[in-house]
Amino acid sequence: MTDRSNGRSNKAILADTPARDGRPKAVFRSAGDRFLLVEFGEMELDLTLNFRVLGLNQALKDAKIDGVVETIPALRSILIHYDSTVLPPAALIRHVDNHFAALPPVENLSIPSRRITLPMAFNDQWTRADIARYVQYIRKDAPNIINGNNIDYAAMYNGLRDAEEFIAYIMATEWWNAANGFFPGLPFMFPIDPRYAVVIPKYNPTRPWTPEGAVGIAGPCLAIYPVASPGGYQMIGRTIPIYDPQQRNPAFAANPILMQPGDRVTFTRVNDDDLVELRERVNDGSYVYQIEPGVLDVGEYLQHLESIKEETQAFRRRQGEGAERTPVP
C-alpha cells in the first residue's frame, strides 16, 4: 500500500493499493474529517466489484472496530463514518486494507441476499399523468415520449418488438440492489441476468415531477422513487411503498427503508386498480410483503454467466442496432 497522505498532487487521496492476486486496486480518499471513501477497481459496471464491497462491508461490521460509526456500501465503493479522535485515519486505512485482503476470492463469496417480490403496474395512470405534464410544460418534442409513455421508446431503443416484449424483459430477471442512495431508501438495481439488461438514456431536461413509487430506468440501472421528486429516469410503472418513515406496515417495523444492498427484486404485473388496493393495504398494515431470506453464491452465478454468454452477446447486438436507429433525448 502506498501512503499518499503527505503528497502534494492530490491531498484527498490518502493511500492506494494496486491490483494484485486477483483483487482490484483500491483508492482511499479523505471525505472530510469524519469519513473515509474507499473506491475499488475501474469506473465501470462490474457486479463482482459490488460483491466484494458487500463482503468487505460485512467483514467490517463483524469486526466491530472501535471508532467506526457506520459503513455505507455503494456500487464499487464504501463510505466509512468514523471518529478520528478514537481511530486515526491511517489506522482505519490499515484495518480496511487488511479486511479487504482477507476476503476470499470473489468466486468463493456468498452474499446474504433476500428475495423480494413487488407488484408493478406498467404504463400506469400516475406516471402517464406526469409524462403528460412534461410534454405540456417542459418539452413538447421529447423523443423518449411515444404514445404518452416512456415504454414504447425503451422498447425501440433496445431493439425489442414492442412494449409488451420490453415488459417481459423487466419481469424475466432478478434485479440486484447494489446500493441505496440519492433519496432515503432509493435502491440502485441492476439486472442479474445480462440477457435482459435493457439500457435507456435519461430525460433531457429532467422532470420536475415523479410519483412516489415510480419505477424508472436510466442506463442499465433500475430505481424505485421512495418519495415524490424530480427525476430523469424513464418511467415504466409504479409499485407499492418501499419507504415509510411512519412505519405503518410490519415490513417497516425495524427499518423505515424496505430494501437493503444485496437484495434481489422481481416484479409481478398488476393493473392500476389492483395497485390502488395493494397500496391501501400497505398503509393500513394488512399487506404482507413477499420477502424470503437467501444467499447469492457468487461462484454459481459466474458459472451461469459463462453458460449464457452467447445469448447475452446476441441480445447486445440486437440492442446496439436498436440504439443506433433511435434518437437520444
Regions found by a protein language model. Give the residues of each.
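Glycine-rich active-site loops that engage anionic ligands at enzyme catalytic sites
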Residues: 2-329
